[in-house]
C-alpha cells in the first residue's frame, strides 16, 4: 500500500530519521522527520503552471505548532489553533530565507511549503528540524531546487562551542546561533550572543557548516531512492534572447545615466523615466514590452553591480567602507519615558522606550510552557517611510522579523530583573527608509533605553553589510542602501558594542559565500560599528542616573513565603485595599518578592508600611492601629497587622469602670491598641486604656499597667 523509504543517522548524539511515502502522499514532496522525540511533517507543493502576467516567484512557507505536540489543549474560547504566533512567524522566515535563493532565476510557479510540528520533546528545536525536513521534501518533490539545504544550532557553554544544544542547555549558553547552507557553503546565519568576538562568531559558523554535512548526505541518500522526476524548466526562446540583447543595447546608457543621481527620490524618478523611454523605443520597434519587464530589472542590476565593481563608487557616491552621515538625538518627546531620533542618511528611526511594572510583562504561551518576558521591542514600517501609499494595520512578517533582530541585539545588555525590576517596551517607528532600518532601530533603541534611565553597561549599534560578487571579483559594502540590498548578493547585519557582537543575521542570495568573504565582512562591520558608536556618543554615552520622572518609581521588598497569602488576602481583598489606600501598584511573586510601583515616594512608603505591618509579628509593648471588627459583653475584637485579630478586654477599653463595651467602641471604629501579652492559646491580648487615642502615645505610666491600680509613686 505504501511506497515507504526511511533514512536514519546519528547526529550530535541523537538519532535523526527521515521518512517518506507513508503520510501526505498527494503532496509533491512529503517527509516525516524525527529528531529525538520531536516530530515534524514537512510538505512541498508546486503549481503546475504559471499565472499569466506573473513576473515574480511566489514562495510561501507556513510553520505551525500544534498544541497536541506538547500534550496541551489550546486556550481561548474556541480551543483550537488560531493565527500564527510571533514565534511561528519567525520560524517560517527562518525556513524561507535559506531556501528561497536556491530556486532557478526564471522559475515563476507558485510553491507552498508547510511544516507542522506534531510532537515536541522539550529538548530538540522544532525550527531546526523543520528546516531540514522542508529541504528534504523539496529535494524529493521534483520541483526545480538547487539543494539540499541543512542547518545546525550552535551554542557556547563554559567557553566551548556545542552543536545542537538542548532547550535547557541553551539557557546557559553565551551564544545561540543558527546556520544553514548547502554542501558548498553558508546561506543563512541568525544569532544572539553575549558580546563575543568576530573570530568566535566565524568559528561557530564554520563549525555549524561542517556539522550538518552528514544531514545533507542523508537527504541525498533518501532522494536516490524516493525522489520524483525533475520538472522541465522552460528555456528562453529565440525571441526572448533577441529581446534581452535589444534591451541591453537600448537601455544600458539610459539606466547608467539615471543612476548617476545621488538622492533617492530623484533617482527613482529618473530610473522610472529611463524605463519609460526604453519601453517607448521597444514599442516603436514592435517588441513585447510586457515580456521585457523582468529584463529591465536584470539590466538595472547589471548596471549598478558593474559600476560598483569597476569604480568602487556606490549609488550615492560613497566608497565601499564609508558610513552615511549620522545624527543622534535623545529626549525629543516630553512625556515619553525615553526617546531618540536616529538618522543615518535617508534612513530614520523614531524610537520610544516605556517602563512598566511586572503586571505589564508579556505572557507567552509556547509549546515548552507559559513564560513571561519583561522586554519587548516592536518595529513599525509605515508606507510613508518610503514615500508610498500602502497597507496600515497589524505587523507583517518582515516587521516581526526586524523587531526580533533588534531585540536580540539589545537583550544581552539588559540588566537583570533583580537589578532593574521594570518591564521595558521599545517601539521603533521607521519614519524614513533607504536601507538598514533594522540597524537604525538597534541604535535608536539603545539610546532610548539609556534616555529612560535603563542602566545598559554599554551602548549598542548595528550596521548592514552588502556584497556584489561576480566572476571577475567581489566588493563588500558597508551600510548598504535599499537598492544595494535588492540588487546585491548579501544582506549581512551585525550588531554589538565596542566589546563584541550581540546579534548577527546573514542572508545570501547566491548559492553560497566563502569564509574569506565572511571574515572581511565581519571586520569591515566592526570598523563601521565603532564609528557609529562614536556618533551615538555625541548624544548619550550611558544610562541616565535615574529613571525618567514620568516613569513609575519601583521599590522591591521581600516577605516570608508563608506570609504571601496574608498580603494577598481572601480573593485579593487585602492587596486591593493596599492599592486603594496607597495609590501604588503592588505585585507579589511566588518567591515573596513584592514589587511596588508608585508615582512618588509618599505612595511607595504608604504601601510598604502597610505590607510590613501585615507581615510583622506582634511585639509586646508596641502600639498598632486597628479596626474594631466585633464587640461582645466581655470586650472588643480588633483587627490589626493585616489579618490578625486580638482581644481588648472590657477592663482594657478605657480607664475606670466600663459598664458596656458599646459605651466605648462600636464595630468599624478605628482605634489604637498596645500589645500587652498572649493568652495560653497564643491569642493576642490588647489594651486601648494605656494608649492616648488621639495621639497614639503610650500613657501606661500615668494610668497604671493594670486596670484600677494607679501607678506606685515613690515617697517624697
Swiss-Prot record:
Localization terms from the record: Cytoplasm
Reactions mediated catalytically: RNA(n+1) + phosphate = RNA(n) + a ribonucleoside 5'-diphosphate
Record bears the keyword Cell cycle: no
Positions of Mg(2+) binding: 485, 491
An annotated Gene Ontology molecular function: polyribonucleotide nucleotidyltransferase activity
Cofactor list: Mg(2+)
Domain KH: 552-611
GO cellular component: cytosol
BP-aspect Gene Ontology terms: mRNA catabolic process; RNA processing
This enzyme's EC code(s): 2.7.7.8
Protein keywords: Cytoplasm, Magnesium, Metal-binding, Nucleotidyltransferase, RNA-binding, Transferase
Matches recorded under SMART domains: KH, S1
Iron as UniProt keyword: no
Residue span, S1 motif domain: 621-689
NCBIfam families: polynuc_phos (TIGR03591), PRK11824.1 (NF008805)
Entries under PANTHER family matching the protein: POLYRIBONUCLEOTIDE NUCLEOTIDYLTRANSFERASE (PTHR11252), POLYRIBONUCLEOTIDE NUCLEOTIDYLTRANSFERASE 1, MITOCHONDRIAL (PTHR11252:SF0)
Assigned protein family: Belongs to the polyribonucleotide nucleotidyltransferase family.
Function of the protein: Involved in mRNA degradation. Catalyzes the phosphorolysis of single-stranded polyribonucleotides processively in the 3'- to 5'-direction.
Protein name as it appears in the record: Polyribonucleotide nucleotidyltransferase
Organism of derivation: Gluconobacter oxydans (strain 621H)
The encoding gene: pnp
